[in-house]
């Protein structure tokens, strides 16, 4: 068994070195809580980075301060970096000038994180109520944490204070995602087999339950225009939901094992899913077609072997913001960087016991969390996107596949716009 296709010379693949790391604190800690770093997240505006460092705690650090420390000290631990001064408004509209690091004790094992930002003119989708307990400012930045006991806690990023405690799930909250449109609509995925939709502008009202999964739900992700949601889970499940009507659009068939991670491309034209079957699939979410397969074990395993303990479980997948690259993390102690038009990785990096990964807001850095609660960072593959690709992304942001196929243009151009060449 090999990690790369036979035609690929493993020695010719570029191997990256970390540019920095954030190490988990040492003991003593409550031994009842694990050290695993199940989730990492970057703020939408690139101002903060958060990760669950195990032992019930989440650490928030100014991202620019992290980068400065990486440049000054290489891969030294920067968990004690100094605070960064940036202007902000609190929930009451007052000015604060000292956003800084925060260590948040969430009270239970943290399985999921998500940043959410507020756009005041975006009205609540639920009801029009004149009075609210919380009125979020224009530059409000929130952090949602999903816990082992089924609770979701909402924190003010700038102060580290608890704002809301959302209670409705009965099992682990495995993933969280905010709608990118600034509406502060939050979706949670849980081991209780449900997804729940929360309206934080309506004081955290739980407005909808999405049912359809027959087993654990591992992950969920909004499309860039917030109109579609992907959820993935055990028993090969990949579901797409209409988030205007809160109805299921379709179920995607193809994986042979639990599907544990998903992410949309920046233009919403592609969907990446990662599975324990050793594969990452790139889908067209508008028609359910598989456009590309990224294998992590060769020769490709049979469905029976892929559906078992194959030692190549893919744990996480993330789309870069250039729309050209995808990162995946697997149990073979390797992080892979892929181009969407190549079926082999263009760069790799060693990582033992990895659990999660995410690109920074500008796509220049990849962060990955591990079993021991630490985070490692790599500079990502960079290239100037072609004008053709930029035009394709602009078109696909506003036009689904069905409308593209109806355009009176040459077939080769249709294939390019549909990501088939």
From Swiss-Prot:
Domain of life of the source: Eukaryota
GO biological process entries: intracellular signal transduction; protein aggregate center assembly; protein K27-linked ubiquitination; protein polyubiquitination
Domain SOCS box: 372-421
GO CC, any one term: cytosol
Keyword Disulfide bond: no
Cross-referenced InterPro entries: G-protein_beta_WD-40_rep, SOCS_box, SOCS_box-like_dom_sf, WD40/YVTN_repeat-like_dom_sf, WD40_repeat_CS, WD40_repeat_dom_sf, WD40_rpt, WSB_SOCS-box_domain
WD repeat coordinates: 32-71, 124-165, 168-208, 212-251, 254-293, 309-346
GO terms, molecular function: ubiquitin protein ligase activity
A Pfam family reported for this protein in Swiss-Prot or TrEMBL: SOCS_box
UniProt pathway: Protein modification; protein ubiquitination
Keywords linked to the UniProt accession: Repeat, Ubl conjugation pathway, WD repeat
PROSITE patterns according to UniProt: SOCS, WD_REPEATS_1, WD_REPEATS_2, WD_REPEATS_REGION
Keyword Nucleotide-binding on entry: no
Function: Probable substrate-recognition component of a SCF-like ECS (Elongin-Cullin-SOCS-box protein) E3 ubiquitin ligase complex which mediates the ubiquitination and subsequent proteasomal degradation of target proteins. Recognizes type II iodothyronine deiodinase/DIO2. Confers constitutive instability to HIPK2 through proteasomal degradation.
Assembly and oligomerization: Interacts with DIO2. Component of the probable ECS(WSB1) E3 ubiquitin ligase complex which contains CUL5, RNF7/RBX2, Elongin BC complex and WSB1. Component of a probable ECS-like E3 ubiquitin-protein ligase complex which contains CUL5, RBX1, Elongin BC complex and WSB1. Interacts with CUL5, RNF7, ELOB and ELOC. Binds to HIPK2 through WD40 repeats.
Domain-level remarks: The SOCS box domain mediates the interaction with the Elongin BC complex, an adapter module in different E3 ubiquitin ligase complexes.
Name recorded for this polypeptide: WD repeat and SOCS box-containing protein 1
Organism of origin: Homo sapiens (Human)
